[in-house]
């Protein structure tokens, strides 16, 4: 099967960071803390802060793509252009707790297998990895443009 990869630089950087983890206890992973600083959230004091959006913002910004700048995952629903059929590397936004909640999760689309979607993201079990989510949790897919 052939795949089209959107945002190749972003996806590649995400894969380069695969396995990056929060540090236990009082320590903070300096790379995760850099995600926050790079997008102007210098006030964040620890890697225990939800960082899925900071991760996507960071890899988008440093690779020259538009980015939300916000730490709320659902901010990505207003960034980029909505697409109905995603390519590898497109942004995927999911709901968390409930569809009507303000809470969410954001990552990069890898693929769909049956009624599940594989997502490359940060803060997935406290690390950068590929995790599986029910397709029913997807709020939308976004393609970003170079800036």
Regions picked out by a protein language model, each given a short descriptive name:
Residues 131-147:
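Intrinsically disordered, low-complexity, charged/polar segments
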Residues 1-63:
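N-terminal capping segments
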Residues 3-8, 65-129:
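...with weaker cross-activation on analogous glycine-rich loops/strands in unrelated enzymes
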Residues 11, 117, 139:
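A broad, low-specificity signal marking well-ordered, structured residues that form hydrophobic/aromatic
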Residues 1, 61, 85-86, 143-147:
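Short intrinsically disordered terminal tails
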Residues 28-30, 72, 134:
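Helix N-terminus capping/helix-initiation residues
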Residues 45-46, 128-130:
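A generic structural signal for short coil/turn motifs at secondary-structure boundaries
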């Amino acid at each position: 099967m052939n795949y089209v990869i959107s945002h190749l630089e972003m996806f590649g950087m995400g894969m380069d960071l695969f396995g990056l983890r929060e540090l236990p206890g009082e320590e903070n992973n300096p790379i995760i803390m850099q995600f926050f600083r790079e997008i102007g959230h210098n006030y964040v004091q620890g890697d225990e802060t939800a960082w899925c959006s900071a991760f996507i913002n960071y890899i988008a910004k440093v690779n020259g793509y538009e980015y939300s700048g916000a730490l709320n995952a659902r901010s990505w629903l207003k960034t980029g252009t909505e697409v109905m059929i995603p390519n590898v590397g497109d942004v995927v936004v999911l709901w968390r707790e409930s569809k009507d909640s303000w809470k969410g999760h954001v990552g990069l689309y890898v693929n769909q297998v049956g009624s599940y979607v594989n997502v490359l993201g940060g803060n997935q079990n406290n690390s950068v990895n590929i995790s599986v989510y029910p397709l029913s949790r997807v709020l939308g897919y976004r393609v970003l443009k170079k800036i």
